[in-house]
């Protein structure tokens, strides 16, 4: 069929009254699904720690499986976000091109029908949308940091771990010498709710640092030899210290059970 014989135009500009429907066109929001999956991974890590005997030599294989799943999920999420951004750009470009076209009316109908005037076609733009570049996972999350250090602090909750600039790196950590104290330097008691400073990375228990900063907007960091000035809003939850303390308590409990059992055997 010749173009002039088309009974209706191939495409026409977006009608002003259809803007509401056009606005509602979007990629499906999968953010809640991804957050649920991440939550399940965090729960799996907690279950692994809770259900594994502290005397177990290593949990590297289980951690590697969870890490692989987490990285795959993170990549899918990045691809989903990238697709969503492409759809937004597509709609923006389509709207701009459509708005530049003469509106469809009795005087322009035949011109659009014959092809003398043309308007963008959303379906064609979508089919010709550039393929997104391979997505990269988010590589600096608390969960990835925990997965990276878990095999090491499982064996020794007090081991010194280097700063994790890129926890997604496949290289093994080079564990440093020395020991990490699992007691707050302010309260001198075991951590209950450890908070870490985003300025200097020093850790204090919530009650301790709150009492130290009470009545002050800012104050010198209470850690000896630290030159930073801190405020309460500089502190965030420290999941790695929480994990250290949890594993240390489990190991101590097992040691107490072992000593009690040995005492009974002696009797």
Swiss-Prot record:
Protein species of origin: Saccharomyces cerevisiae (strain ATCC 204508 / S288c)
Family affiliation: Belongs to the NSE2 family.
Keywords: Cytoplasm, DNA damage, DNA recombination, DNA repair, Metal-binding, Nucleus, Transferase, Ubl conjugation pathway, Zinc, Zinc-finger
Enzyme class: transferase
ZnF segments: SP-RING-type: 169-256
InterPro entries for the chain: MMS21_N, Nse2(Mms21), Znf_MIZ, Znf_RING/FYVE/PHD
Cellular-component GO terms for this entry: chromosome, telomeric region; cytoplasm; nuclear envelope; nucleus; Smc5-Smc6 complex
Name of this chain's protein: E3 SUMO-protein ligase MMS21
Residues annotated as binding Zn(2+): 200, 202, 221, 226
Biological or metabolic pathway of the protein: Protein modification; protein sumoylation
Residues that span the membrane, as ranges: none
Role description: Acts as an E3 ligase mediating SUMO/Smt3 attachment to SMC5 and YKU70. Acts in a DNA repair pathway for removal of UV-induced DNA damage that is distinct from classical nucleotide excision repair and in repair of ionizing radiation damage. Functions in homologous recombination repair of DNA double strand breaks and in recovery of stalled replication forks.
Catalytic activity, EC: 2.3.2.-
């Amino acid at each position: 069929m010749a173009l002039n014989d088309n009974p209706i135009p191939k495409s026409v500009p977006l009608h002003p009254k259809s803007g509401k429907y056009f606005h509602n066109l979007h990629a499906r929001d999968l953010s809640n699904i991804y957050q649920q999956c991440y939550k399940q991974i965090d729960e799996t890590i907690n279950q692994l720690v809770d259900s594994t005997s502290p005397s177990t030599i290593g949990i590297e294989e289980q951690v590697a499986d969870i890490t692989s799943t987490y990285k795959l999920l993170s990549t899918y999420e990045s691809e989903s976000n990238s697709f969503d951004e492409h759809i937004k750009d597509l709609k923006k470009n389509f709207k701009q091109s459509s708005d530049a076209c003469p509106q469809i009316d009795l005087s322009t109908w035949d011109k659009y029908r014959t092809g003398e005037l043309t308007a963008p076609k959303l379906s064609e733009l979508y089919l010709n949308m550039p393929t997104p570049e391979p997505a990269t996972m988010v590589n600096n999350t608390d969960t990835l940091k925990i997965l990276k250090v878990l095999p090491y602090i499982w064996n020794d909750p007090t081991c010194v771990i280097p700063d994790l600039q890129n926890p997604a790196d496949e290289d093994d950590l080079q564990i440093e010498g020395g020991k990490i104290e699992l007691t707050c330097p302010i309260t001198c008691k075991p951590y209950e709710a450890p908070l870490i400073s985003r300025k200097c990375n020093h850790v204090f228990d919530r009650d301790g640092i709150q009492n130290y900063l009470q009545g002050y907007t800012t104050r010198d960091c209470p850690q000896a030899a630290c030159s930073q000035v801190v405020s309460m809003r500089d502190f965030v939850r420290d999941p790695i210290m929480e994990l250290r303390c949890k594993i240390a308590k489990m190991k101590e409990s097992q040691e107490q059970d072992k000593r009690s059992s040995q005492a009974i055997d002696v009797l």
